Amino acid sequence: MKYKMIASDMDGTLVNDKSELTERTKQAIIKAVDAGVLFVAATGRPFSNVQNVNGLFDKDMPFIIFNGAAAYMGKSEKLLFERFLDFDLAKETFDIGQKLGIAQIVWTGPRLWGNRRCDKTVRYESISKNLSMSIVTDLAAIKDEVDGISKVLWIDDPAKVKELSAEMCAHFGTRLKCVSSMPHFLEFISNDAGKGTALEEIAKLYGIDRSEIIAIGDGQNDICMLKYAGFGVAVENAPDEVKAVCDYVTLSNNDDGVAEVIEKFILK
């Protein structure tokens, strides 16, 4: 099978635990792109936080951000699509978080909001690449000044996030998607969003069949993408529930798992 697209999650998959792209992985990606393969980074991060990958390319490559709630072209910064969360659902989510006393982040396109300044939200702000966090305590107050809500994100310890995820999935049902890109994050996005949906849309834009796609990931939020791709790959550090839906398990994110896949299935 000649694969035409590689889609890879970033944190826990493409980058190592120090958030670094290793030289081996960089070279594998560059060689794949030079061979005509489309490389798509698919992440929960905002667009401002994917420039370490974007900088590898001379070509304009698509990036899936906010766990599939939006996609941009890397060089031209052209918006390909955006799937906002229904405002009333976003407000309901935010209000529940306020009652529970949870540290919350809200993305409205490229703009960053937090429900208060605390260790968790300030740390998130610090990794958001030159973006300043505005404070909001009631989403109704910003409804008229934003285009829409890309996602609401709760930050808590991993055990609490696991508990909250089960509760919120039961509460919202199919009205929205609850996903977790990191053990301490619980994210709420539109039911029309998701990495799998976004990957399908990009594949259609480029005329690529799902059988011609390799997807690589490590988290619960990657499962829909891994299932959509013709060849789903889990990194070794992924939990068993992710490995169970995949066709292949590669090395861990600290051992150049993405590079191993590219070298074995693209550059062989």
Residue ranges and their predicted role:
Residues 25, 50-54, 164, 168, ...:
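Hydrophobic packing residues within well-ordered alpha-helices of enzyme cores
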Residues 2-18:
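Asp-based phosphoryl-transfer active-site loop
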Residues 1-5, 22, 187-268:
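Mg2+-dependent phosphoryl-transfer enzymes with acidic/Ser/Thr/Gly-rich catalytic loops
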Residues 56-59, 67, 75, 172-174, ...:
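Short, structured coil segments at secondary-structure junctions
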Residues 36-40, 59-61, 151, 211-212, ...:
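Short active-site oxyanion
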Residues 20-122:
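Active-site phosphate-binding/coordination module
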Residues 96, 100-216, 220, 224-225, ...:
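Conserved acidic, metal-coordinating active-site core of Asp-based
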Residues 10, 45, 218-219:
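Active-site metal-binding loops of divalent metal-dependent hydrolases
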